[in-house]
A protein has these predicted regions:
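Active-site entrance/lid segments in N-terminal catalytic domains of soluble metabolic enzymes
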Residues: 1-65, 69, 81-84
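Alpha/beta catalytic cores of nucleotide-metabolism and tRNA/nucleoside-modifying enzymes
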Residues: 5-8, 93-115, 119-158
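Glycine-rich, proline-tolerant flexible connector loops at the mouths of alpha/beta enzymes
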Residues: 26, 79-89, 143-147
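Alpha-helix-loop-beta-strand connector modules within alpha/beta enzyme cores
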Residues: 35-53, 86-113
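Conserved, mostly hydrophobic/aromatic
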Residues: 45, 67, 75, 98, ...
Length: 158
């Protein structure tokens, strides 16, 4: 990965010979992630914006329930296409479990629920909507179509 402001990310760890250069880009990118964020920070986000706040990357029903309890407007159930953690449930399974739990608690109309990851065709979109998703994020099929066939490929994919 390259950034126009940083020419060689392999030196993020310093210039000494013992530095592990194999994680340069990953280490540089992770420096932008605030690991101290927690559920209590949602109140601060609410104080600085009137825009709806959604939480992306939800992978468990319990976290979806917490997002609702902390007043988030919606969530995006996502496992990053399964390429980050291959042992987690697919978003469509988490969606089914979450919507069932929300319906049981009469909370299913209080939060928008999107899914992202693992969606490859129109039938996946229909299944997600039928299971209660507000919307579906689709990336990879359109990225491949665009990179291979350009605008025509995206039109055909749609």
């Amino acid at each position: 990965m390259r950034s126009k402001n940083i020419q060689d990310l392999s030196h993020v760890q310093g210039d000494d010979e013992d530095a592990d250069r194999s994680q340069g880009a990953a280490r540089a990118i992770s420096s932008f992630i605030d690991t101290s964020l927690n559920w209590n920070d949602i109140a601060w986000f609410r104080s600085i914006t009137k825009m709806p706040i959604l939480l992306k990357g939800v992978q468990r029903v319990e976290d979806g329930i917490l997002a609702l309890k902390y007043g988030l407007d919606g969530i995006v159930i996502s496992n990053h296409g399964g390429r980050q953690l291959d042992l987690v449930k697919p978003p469509i399974e988490v969606l089914a479990e979450l919507q069932s739990t929300l319906r049981m608690r009469k909370m299913d109309k209080k939060m928008e629920v999107f899914i992202d990851g693992g969606v490859r065709r129109g039938s996946d979109v229909i299944k997600a909507i039928a299971l209660g998703a507000t919307g579906v994020g689709i990336g990879r099929p359109f990225l491949y179509a665009m990179s291979t066939y350009g605008d025509h490929g995206v039109s055909k994919a749609i």
